[in-house]
Amino acid sequence: MRVQSISRPYIRPHSNGPHVFDRARYHEGTVRELRLPRRQVYVHTAHYVGWLAERNKFSRNYASPFLFKLLRMRLVTPIKVYAHFGGCLVDDMLTMEARAFSMSYFDFEQGHYLKDYCALSRSSPDNILRTRFTWQLYGTMLRLIDERFRRWGGSIRTRGRALAA
């Protein structure tokens, strides 16, 4: 498989409104059936939302600097950040670069995010809602998403500096 080294431009997949990557409410019925705590509807996507927040990939209209700082300090979990956005991740919330990357990587059908998440959390796609949040898994996911993003051709800003792709 050839690694894509140049980032692709963002093209909205359809013209009738924003593209919804995921909504926590899509998983409420399953979480209820499995008798899991309600917060489990957030966990698998919260890892990605946390990465977006920590890497400054939210658009200005959605950036929440204080909350994101608390996340970086590990005083709130990415679940709290995702809940702050109503448990919804939509393309309009992201920078253009993050939208393009998310269309490629975070797509549940074609992308690598769920495969990566399942591999690192040692769960199957049928069991991801059972995976509990841990800071260790979150840290490992951050590093892996960083690597996927660099391979895709993106640059990561940390404290005002861009890291080479």
Regions found by a protein language model. Give the residues of each.
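N-terminal low-complexity, intrinsically disordered segments
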Residues: 2-76
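Polar/charged low-complexity regulatory segments
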Residues: 13, 20-28, 34-35, 52, ...
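Intrinsically disordered or highly flexible coil/loop and linker segments, enriched in small
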Residues: 57-61, 111, 154, 158
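Amphipathic protein-protein interaction modules
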Residues: 71-141
